[in-house]
Swiss-Prot record:
Residue positions of the active site: H42, E69, H190
Organism ancestry: Bacteria, Pseudomonadati, Pseudomonadota, Betaproteobacteria, Neisseriales
Catalytic reaction list: 3-amino-2-oxopropyl phosphate + 1-deoxy-D-xylulose 5-phosphate = pyridoxine 5'-phosphate + phosphate + 2 H2O + H(+)
Subunit-level organization: Homooctamer; tetramer of dimers.
NCBIfam families xref list: pdxJ, PRK05265.1-1, PRK05265.1-3, PRK05265.1-5
Record's protein name: Pyridoxine 5'-phosphate synthase
GO cellular component: cytosol
């Protein structure tokens, strides 16, 4: 199983004081060295954390691959074609939200998503859609030509009871298997921590987890190398469990 380390909140800390540190590039390189299989960055329309220059700098520095999260807008499409990341994950975006609140509604935007997916694919960029684990959305993702889906794990991570967490986990598990049966590559992420990652990492249909906020939070106490190492180890151990 692959670990994508999202470095958005390195930029959040930097921007809080308007300094040049901590460096997203340095964070990306440290994460790579200690187990990250790819680096994920979300260039939001309001540029609240990652800036355009960060994306270019990280793309040019890393040895693994860049997964660029972006909204379904012409501006972001143009940026992606300039940066040429290995992967683009199209996500829903609202300016007033603190973080991404739900999955992309592919059913409501099939024509536009299909257009973007074709342009990116023709440019050699692999397209992923960040969606809820809903069979209709998963089928729509396949129909618009996206080869990859990233299942939104936020409801699982935020569940307020054990029963609700189990319900949300089963939804993710079933969605992952359904997507896999359709021939889609399945990733997952949002809200995952060292404490809740094990069940999700046990789902064999899921190839990759993208994790950011909790890793950066752990890094405040452990250091980024150890935070990445521990997460990677937790994912590895999960795959060994029966």
């Amino acid at each position: 199983m692959l670990l994508g380390v999202n470095i958005d909140h390195i930029a959040t800390v930097r921007n809080a004081r308007g300094t040049t540190y901590p460096s997203p590039v340095e964070a990306a390189l440290v994460a790579e060295t200690h187990g990250a299989d790819l680096i994920t960055m979300h260039l939001r329309e309001d540029r609240r954390h990652i800036k355009d220059a960060d994306v270019f700098a990280v793309k040019n520095a890393i040895r693994t691959r860049l997964n660029l999260e972006m909204a379904l807008t012409e501006e972001m499409l143009e940026n992606a074609l300039k940066v040429m990341p290995e992967d683009v994950c199209i996500v829903p975006e609202k300016r007033q939200e603190i973080t991404t609140e739900g999955g992309l509604d592919v059913l409501a935007q099939q024509e536009k998503i299909a257009e973007f997916a074709k342009i990116l694919t023709d440019a050699g960029i692999r397209v992923s859609l960040f969606i809820d684990a809903d069979d209709r959305q998963i089928q729509a993702a396949r129909d618009v030509g996206a080869p990859v889906v990233e299942l939104h794990t936020g409801a699982y991570a935020d569940a307020q009871s054990h029963a609700e967490q189990i319900r949300q986990f089963e939804r993710i598990q079933n969605g992952a298997h359904f997507a896999g049966d359709l021939g889609l590559v399945v990733n997952a992420g949002h809200g995952l921590t060292i404490h809740n990652v094990t069940p999700v990492a046990q789902i064999l249909a899921i190839r990759e987890l993208n994790i950011g906020h909790s890793l950066i939070a752990q890094a405040l106490f452990l250091g980024l190398p150890e935070a990445v190492r521990q997460m990677k180890e937790a994912m590895f151990r999960a795959r060994l469990l029966p």
